[in-house]
Structures are given as C-alpha cells and as structure tokens.
Regions:
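Residue-level detector of conserved catalytic or cofactor/ligand-binding positions
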Residues: 195-204
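Short hydrophobic beta-strand that contains or immediately precedes a catalytic carboxylate
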Residues: 9-11
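Short, basic/hydrophobic alpha-helical segments
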Residues: 77-90
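Acidic-residue sensor for enzyme active/binding pockets
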Residues: 13, 26, 202
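Metal-dependent phosphoesterase core characteristic of DEDDh/y 3'-5' exonuclease domains
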Residues: 5-6, 22-25, 31-33, 37-63, ...
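Short acidic, Gly/Ser-rich segments with clustered Asp/Glu that frequently serve as metal-coordination loops
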Residues: 13-20
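Metal-dependent phosphoesterase signature
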Residues: 63-80
Length: 204
C-alpha cells in the first residue's frame, strides 16, 4: 500500500433515484487514512439546478432539500463536478461510500459525462480505486458476523440499511438523509468492522 494512501468517503443526496436522468442536490465527503481516522477538512457542496430539470417531489420530501435551497447555497454543476473531481483524483485515493457502486458512483459518472469530464479516469488513474462498504458489511454478516449488532426487518430478514445498522450499534446518525451525516455514519461503521475483524484475528 502506498504511504500516502487515503480513503475519500462520500455520499450524495439527489432529486431522484435514477442516476442517468436525475440530478445531484448535495455532496459530502471526508478524507481518512487507512485506519479511517479523519485527515482532511470535510467537503460539503450543493448543486444549483437548471431550469430544464424537474425534481421528484418524493425526493424533496425524503431529504428535506429543496431546489430553492440548492440554488441559494449551491454552485453551478460544472463547478460542482470540478470540485468533486479534485478530491477524487488525488493520487492513491480509494473512493468509498455505502452503496456507492450501485448508486453514488453512477451519479458521479453521469454528472461528469454531462460536464465533459472523463467519467472513469478518477477511479483508476494514479493508483486510485473505488470500494463499497455495503458489500463488506454483507460479507461480514455471511462469513464473520461477530462484533456487530445486526438489524432485521419485520419479516426476520437481515437489513443492511445504514440507518438501521447505525441504530443497532449505537452509532450517532440523527439525520439519515443528510449527505454529511451519512458520511460520518459510514466512517463509524468502517471503524466498527475494522475493530471487530482485528479482535477476531487475535482470537484465532
């Protein structure tokens, strides 16, 4: 592993569930070292909305973020994209989130493409990579569940929703649909898994 390796843990809130056609509302990210200790200043961005896009009302109700708030606090989508690219493109960065492979990374790619930025280069160039903590959580449940309090739905099936797991494990996560709150919760879950796996290795 490179001596300057870092994770950049991030999350979007958006105005819809389809990364191909919907737009980002809010971006948050934090850089950590390999042990998930915070080493950089938090990044919080809002994206101004264009007049040719209609947000999904359901998304506004879930996140509480309105187009008016984004237009008041935000920056244009080209500038929004450039600032995200600057964070993602630092050498030896592993870009990570919770369910990011299936959603947030796709939101990034479509946003970059729309703004004439290579949508893939950030994830491989200069020793960079991407990773999804959700898949690690699922693997822990299947292979080494000790050390984590697991959450279950009413039908008895395991739930891997971040807000349910943080509640089950006493992790602060007051606003589950704020991007920065989700980033801090993801970091806390990553630390919990790392500590749990280390204690398992010590017992072997």
């Amino acid at each position: 592993m490179a001596t300057d390796f870092s994770f950049f843990i991030y999350d979007y809130e958006s105005f819809g569930i389809n990364p191909a056609s919907d737009r980002p509302a809010q971006f948050a990210g934090i850089r950590t070292d390999a042990d998930f200790n915070i080493i950089g200043e938090p990044v919080m961005l809002y994206c101004k909305q264009t007049n040719d896009y209609l947000p999904a009302p359901e998304a506004v109700m879930v996140t509480g973020i309105t187009p008016q708030e984004c237009n008041e606090k935000g920056i244009s989508e080209p500038e929004f994209s450039a600032k995200i690219l600057a964070e993602f493109s630092q050498p030896n960065t592993c870009v990570m989130g919770y369910n990011n492979i299936r959603y947030d990374d796709e939101m990034t790619r479509y946003t970059f493409y729309r703004n004439f930025i290579d949508p893939y280069e950030y994830s491989w160039k200069n020793g960079n990579s991407r990773w999804d903590l959700l898949d690690v959580v699922r693997a822990c449940y299947a292979l080494r569940p000790e050390g984590i309090n697991w959450a279950y739905d009413d039908d008895g099936m395991p739930s891997f929703r971040l807000e349910k797991l943080t509640k089950a494990n006493g992790i602060e996560h007051e606003n589950a649909h704020d991007a920065m709150a989700d980033v801090y919760a993801t970091i806390a879950m990553a630390k919990l898994i790392k500590i749990g796996r280390a204690s398992c290795r010590e017992r072997v």
